[in-house]
Design a protein with these regions (language model features):
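Generic helix-packing signal
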Residues: 14-17, 32, 44, 62-66, ...
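Compact, glycine-rich, soluble single-domain proteins
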Residues: 42-56
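Short beta-strand scaffold segments in enzyme catalytic cores
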Residues: 25-32
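Short, solvent-exposed cationic patches
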Residues: 54-74
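C-terminal binding/interaction regions
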Residues: 2-19, 70-132
Length: 132
């Protein structure tokens, strides 16, 4: 699957977002090495803390099906905003644990895209090693 196909699938997920408060729809597509993929959309709640972001939705779905970080090929996150989608702090922390450090992460909107990694997005990570 090429990058544009991933972006298109992620926009399909964004179209299913539940964002009545922010109207900021985000979608994600997590491609696995075996060719399967998982979609995620942001799901908002009147109690904002209960909102779940698109990238966490996709990664959690994959984990629910038994996939783990070594099974992932690429994560793609998109939005309809003026700037490319970028994971929030909570998502960066979650992705730092549930993705390999060098897993490509495609960030895009309708006009632009870039490829990064969680190591680049969150250089000083809090890990289980910090609790020892």
């Amino acid at each position: 699957m090429n990058q544009q196909q991933l972006i298109n699938l992620a926009f399909t997920a964004a179209d299913n977002a539940y964002a009545p408060y922010s109207n900021y729809k985000v979608g994600a597509c997590l491609l696995c090495k075996d060719g399967n993929y998982f979609l995620g959309a942001n799901i908002e709640n009147a109690s904002y803390g209960d909102t779940n972001c698109a990238e966490r939705s996709a990664v959690f779905a994959a984990y629910s099906y038994g996939y783990r970080k070594d099974d992932f090929d690429t994560l793609c996150i998109v939005c309809y905003g003026k700037t490319i989608a970028a994971p929030c702090g909570i998502c960066r922390q979650v992705l730092s644990e549930l993705l390999n450090q060098d897993t490509p992460i495609v960030l895009a909107n309708k006009e632009n895209s870039m490829v990064t990694t969680i190591a680049e997005l969150l250089p000083m990570q809090f890990t289980s090693e910090d609790m020892k």
